[in-house]
Amino acid sequence: MKKFILLGLLALGACAQPGAPPACTAPLKPAVEINLYFGRDKPGGGEVSDTEWAAFLNDTVTPRFPDGLSVLNVEGQSRGASGVSRERTKLLVVVVFDAPAHQARIAEVVAAYRSRFGQHSVFRSEQPVCAGS
């Protein structure tokens, strides 16, 4: 059930566009922070292992975002018909300066994870930020 809830949230998120770019002070520039939440529970039982995740990151994610990304270990939870369920999750954070140009790459990563690990959804959020180094 939690997968269907996340799928619904993903669908809603796909309809929303990030807000207007913030007014940034130099050297920062307007950008978009994209967060993808990859649940690690497999539908038939078990979990996406650290080795499986590392392979996915290396062969699917990194080639699409070679300029950099961050991965955090988080504990996700959702409420379904049977109550609250908890799941270990990988949070992928990517900051991009041209969000429309990266939408296909994001979609490819999400589709690859869903296919490779039998997931129903990957939750996604986006927000305008100021970024730079």
Feature map (PLM): residue ranges:
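C-terminal motif of bacterial Sec signal peptides marking the signal peptidase cleavage site
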Residues: 11-14
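Terminal, regulation- and interaction-focused segments at domain boundaries
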Residues: 31-50, 93
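Short beta-strand/turn micro-motifs at beta-sheet edges
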Residues: 21-26, 78-82
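Structural recognition of the beta-strand scaffold that forms the well-ordered cores
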Residues: 35, 70-71, 123
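Positively charged n-region of N-terminal signal peptides that target proteins for export
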Residues: 1-4
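Helix-rich interaction surfaces within compact, conserved domain-sized segments
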Residues: 84-133
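Bacterial signal peptide processing site
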Residues: 16-18
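Mature extracytoplasmic domains of secretory-pathway proteins
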Residues: 52-89, 95-101
